[in-house]
Amino acid sequence: MGSFSMWHWLIVLVIVLLLFGRGKIPELMGDVAKGIKSFKKGMTDEDAPDTAKTVDHKADETK
């Protein structure tokens, strides 16, 4: 009862193929890849301005 055997995975694969068809699965995987790529780009875009915000502060001379 604990783990899936090879037959379980084959049955799941057949059901997925019947539901989505052969043409739809690559399309779905492409959409997932685009989403991951967009997420990574968004994460690096947020980090980039933080490193660019360096301010040089000059010390005031008082006598």
Swiss-Prot record:
Membrane-crossing segments per the record: 1-21
Any one GO molecular-function label of the UniProt entry: protein transmembrane transporter activity
Lipid biosynthesis among keywords: no
Gene Ontology process terms (BP): protein transport by the Tat complex
Keywords: Cell inner membrane, Cell membrane, Membrane, Protein transport, Translocation, Transmembrane, Transmembrane helix, Transport
SUBUNIT field: The Tat system comprises two distinct complexes: a TatABC complex, containing multiple copies of TatA, TatB and TatC subunits, and a separate TatA complex, containing only TatA subunits. Substrates initially bind to the TatABC complex, which probably triggers association of the separate TatA complex to form the active translocon.
Name this protein carries in UniProt: Sec-independent protein translocase protein TatA
Organism: Rhizobium leguminosarum bv. trifolii (strain WSM2304)
